[in-house]
Amino acid sequence: MTTVKTNLLDLDRKGLRTYFAEELNEKAFRADQIMKWIYQFGCDDFDQMTNINKKLREKLKRVAEIRAPYVSQAQHSVDGTIKWAMRVGDQDVETVYIPDGDRATLCVSSQVGCALACTFCSTAQQGFNRNLRVSEIIGQVWRAAKEIGIEKDTGRRPITNVVMMGMGEPLLNMKNLIPALEIMLDDIGFGLSKRRVTVSTSGVVSGLDQMTGNIDVALAISLHAPTDELRSQIMPINDRFNIATFLESVSRYIEQSNANRGRVTVEYILLDHVNDDMEHARQLAVLLKDTPAKINLIPFNPYPGSPYRKPSNSRIDRFMKTLMEYDFTVTVRKTRGDDIDAACGQLVGDVIDRTKRTQVKQHDGEQIPVKTV
């Protein structure tokens, strides 16, 4: 009978120590040694772990494995951005490497597809398939680090930042998200600063409240409209958690967070003549007057079949200046990797079958109403 091996990438430090103690009858420091080999040296071969005795290495080869997603396709943009289709099981998710000056950001997926049906997002058109496991989330970071040259100088900047802004809604996969974040932050894992790991959410309040007091990372919120009426039209999640409820949850999280330095990043996609009028800017400023926020404007990136258009530069500029009149810090996101469909809202896995979503999807016990497409 074939033994089902434990994928060590599914375990954070606490889980790995428990596994070593209860399943292998080994001490905690051995688990820590293995964790360093995996994440700090990019090692997936027990035989190469030279400070581990041979008896333990042989035992690990029988019962455990280090199995990350593998790259099934890679596309390189002229601006240095790389998009990888990473194979998880029999499907692909997309992971994007974005170099920019002295930093390099990795955009990581949390689900295969997405159930939230945001009308401006190409990923949403796929529907939802499943949540990613811990090994499939953290494995994207592990594989990307290998691809850009963790063991040798490739001339590419190592990963300095991770953003959970790829395929899926992270807070609908809390069971697997939290351990993956713990590994990113762990000093014997990837050792990233909590200010350099960002979770973006479309407004799953139940998940955000679960994060509050349990994990401290930077927070970005996908707001995209200043009123409930408009937001519900383009983001059906608003029918479950309206703007006021969402912002109250954000305030609770920010109050206990050191990573956010007292303010949240508000993401606002600009859709031509939909949510980009000057009145929308004024409404947004009033809405956020009691929320310490940095506003990141995201000009829409068109994709085939989309009903929306990117606003003109003059409309983008007027919207930004209107917000700045209210003393907000406002940035306009640079479009990166759009020539390889890697820009925000364009993450579409070519090999994933396009399936119609049901009216209600179940995730981690949370029922979220969605619209069919």
UniProtKB/Swiss-Prot annotation:
Its EC number is 2.1.1.192. Disulfide bonds join C107-C344. It is an enzyme of class 2 (transferase). One of its GO terms (biological process) is rRNA base methylation. The active site is at E94, C344. It catalyses: adenosine(2503) in 23S rRNA + 2 reduced [2Fe-2S]-[ferredoxin] + 2 S-adenosyl-L-methionine = 2-methyladenosine(2503) in 23S rRNA + 5'-deoxyadenosine + L-methionine + 2 oxidized [2Fe-2S]-[ferredoxin] + S-adenosyl-L-homocysteine; adenosine(37) in tRNA + 2 reduced [2Fe-2S]-[ferredoxin] + 2 S-adenosyl-L-methionine = 2-methyladenosine(37) in tRNA + 5'-deoxyadenosine + L-methionine + 2 oxidized [2Fe-2S]-[ferredoxin] + S-adenosyl-L-homocysteine. Pfam families: Radical_SAM (PF04055), RlmN_N (PF21016). S-adenosyl-L-methionine binds at G168, E169, S200, S222, L223, H224, N301. CDD domains: Radical_SAM. InterPro entries: Aldolase_TIM, Methyltransferase_A, RlmN_N, RNA_MTrfase_RlmN, rRNA_lsu_MTrfase_RlmN/Cfr, rSAM. Specifically methylates position 2 of adenine 2503 in 23S rRNA and position 2 of adenine 37 in tRNAs. m2A2503 modification seems to play a crucial role in the proofreading step occurring at the peptidyl transferase center and thus would serve to optimize ribosomal fidelity. Belongs to the radical SAM superfamily. RlmN family. Reaction proceeds by a ping-pong mechanism involving intermediate methylation of a conserved cysteine residue. This is Dual-specificity RNA methyltransferase RlmN. It comes from Photobacterium profundum (strain SS9).
